[in-house]
Amino acid sequence: MIYQGETLTVSYLEDGIAELRFDAPGSVNKLDRATLLSLSEAIAALQQERELKGLILTSGKDAFIVGADITEFLELFDLPQADLLGWLKKANDIFSAIEDLPVPTLSAIKGHALGGGCETILSTDFRLADTSAKIGLPETKLGIMPGFGGTVRLPRVIGADNALEWITTGKDYRADDALKVGAIDAVVAPDALQSAAVQMIKDAVKGKLDWQGRRAAKKAPLRLSKLEAMMSFTTAAGMVAAVAGKHYPAPMTAVKTVEAAAGMSRDEALAVEAQGFIKLAKTDVAKALVGIFLNDQHIKALAKKAAKQAAKATSHAAVLGAGIMGGGIAYQSASKGIPAVMKDINEKALALGMGEATKLLNGQLEKGRIDGIKMGQVLSAITPTLSYDNVKHVDVVVEAVVENPKVKAAVLGEVEGIIGEDAVLASNTSTIPISLLAKELKRPQNFCGMHFFNPVHRMPLVEIIRGEQTSDETINRVVAYAAAMGKSPVVVNDCPGFFVNRVLFPYFFGFNKLVADGADFAAVDKVMEKEFGWPMGPAYLLDVVGIDTGHHAGDVMAQGFPARMSKEGRTAIDVMYEVNRFGQKNGKGFYAYEQDKKGKPKKVADAASYELLAPIAKPKQDFDKDAIIARMMIPMINEVVLCLEEGIVATPAEADIALVYGLGFPPFRGGVFRYLDTIGLDRYVAMADQYADLGPLYRVSDKLREMAAQGKTFY
């Protein structure tokens, strides 16, 4: 044994060839501070080995290295700049030391080698992968960029154009795709990885493979003429500007970093990379995106805990109500290996539901994500039926019929009498209180809400709603089922609108008030999209959701919270609803809709909307972007804070994930609580106080005011 640490070991395999094996306690290898320290000690030990002829890096896990330890990031980002630079320098000295060993080096890769894991394999002379390997540099998705030499070595291995695509998109690549661009040198079957790695390093030792030439190219400036460099970096910058936009600086900083370091040797280039990394690490965007990742991990941990505590796992499910939503839920369940019965009273609805599942599977097939066999397996795992016979023995029933309390109550009561006594019932409702639907049930403890978002296959959030009598066992089983479906379940307590819709409608009330005060709805949309960062502004979102749906939900919210959400006369939403302008579904809402070349609805301005709104609005007035953002966001933020104070949602982390995953809250802002921490509670309270005369939705809670006075934060 040359070296033994807690997360890695080094020992000889045969004839002077050493193996450095990453094998941390736990399920995955990460490049945390402890592992980097061990790696430094291991390389120092190898430098003293006179018998050393070659080195192979391997993993004792299913994945090579999944990346750095992101739980350490926020603490690192808060370090003084000089300390952060020192940490980066120490880490990069380790990878440079691997690259400078006087013997050939090789990485034998299985599973994921991402982020720091990818940068580790780039430090070796050769990269051999098995068919399970996936490699990539996802750092820009976290608001940062590679900091362990990724922007230096990858362009010199696969060329600037390919490297810029890898780094700026943050995608991971399968072994065969990585082989095509030269990121890895060969792909073998998993059972051949070890023997092939030993043979390859032996060939390098014997001089059959030019490891020194490869190494020299990696440490030299990029081989690009001035014209090639100009074309490469200008094209990349243009594409990044169009895709990432102004709110996400990491991809553009990465492009500028690779460009600035193109003519430099390795050590000079690493210094440039470190400056780019530090610049990004100090941004609010990086903290927000890392925060989302950590919150997501928190949600996953809660779901794992629920699955362990549940007395029974879900092996069979049923969906009541087919159509697009029911078909989407059944597809999601079946595609993740949980067969689903899809029950409806209407043959056409069943056909529509199966059609939705088939369409989604065809999309997967066309993209090469599944093959025909997998498609057949998923479709055969969905059983469409007009009868309850196949529903009797399922573990979970998801009711997804029309959003009408009487219809839902009747269907729930009917199916409760058919299923087993320990089976769980869940209602996919967006507004109807769970405790109300539970009143007619014999086993209300086995009932909860399970609110999916549309389209089901794309929206990661599922709200799990706990009614007054819902048992912990029911919550645990439904949370575990949602997670098994590949969703992010957030448990909320019952109230009108639950969490997501409850906080969305104050935002729409803010919109109604702005339009009534003379704002142009299209100008409001533009500010909320381009400046604040929502995927859709409020008018466009209402058109997409359906103004009839929004109108109904708004009435429900007004009844549920009359002191804050009751209407003051006719609103912009009322006006559109009264003349049957329901949005995209019938071609006219706030905007008119035409079909684009792909047959998808495209919004266009419609003068008729302004004529219809004129009677309820003051004369046209221009509001600056700060006023629009404040008037739109304060009602939502205040309601989110109230939901936390009332225990509707348990933690800031769960609230922020629900907002990002369920509403499309701008990820670069991290969610309402991260946003409040970023701007400062004192500043927020002062801003909200300026608008307090607009009504109760604009008035901050006493508790928030107290937190602001004490200088507290949510995270």
From Swiss-Prot:
The keyword Membrane does not apply. Substrate binds at D296, N501, Y661. InterPro entries: 3-OHacyl-CoA_DH_CS (IPR006180), 3-OHacyl-CoA_DH_NAD-bd (IPR006176), 3HC_DH_C (IPR006108), 6-PGluconate_DH-like_C_sf (IPR008927), ClpP/crotonase-like_dom_sf (IPR029045), Enoyl-CoA_hydra/iso (IPR001753), FA_oxidation_alpha_subunit (IPR050136), FadB (IPR012799). Coiled coil: none annotated. GO terms for cellular component: fatty acid beta-oxidation multienzyme complex. Transmembrane segments: none annotated. The active site is at H451. Residues 311-715 are annotated as: 3-hydroxyacyl-CoA dehydrogenase. Keywords: Fatty acid metabolism, Isomerase, Lipid degradation, Lipid metabolism, Lyase, Multifunctional enzyme, NAD, Oxidoreductase. It catalyses: a (3S)-3-hydroxyacyl-CoA + NAD(+) = a 3-oxoacyl-CoA + NADH + H(+); a (3S)-3-hydroxyacyl-CoA = a (2E)-enoyl-CoA + H2O; a 4-saturated-(3S)-3-hydroxyacyl-CoA = a (3E)-enoyl-CoA + H2O; (3S)-3-hydroxybutanoyl-CoA = (3R)-3-hydroxybutanoyl-CoA. The keyword NAD applies. One of its GO terms (molecular function) is delta(3)-delta(2)-enoyl-CoA isomerase activity. NAD(+) binds at M325, D344, V401, V402, E403, K408, S430, N454. The record marks E119, E139 as: Important for catalytic activity. Involved in the aerobic and anaerobic degradation of long-chain fatty acids via beta-oxidation cycle. Catalyzes the formation of 3-oxoacyl-CoA from enoyl-CoA via L-3-hydroxyacyl-CoA. It can also use D-3-hydroxyacyl-CoA and cis-3-enoyl-CoA as substrate. In the N-terminal section; belongs to the enoyl-CoA hydratase/isomerase family. In the C-terminal section; belongs to the 3-hydroxyacyl-CoA dehydrogenase family. This is Fatty acid oxidation complex subunit alpha. The gene is fadB.
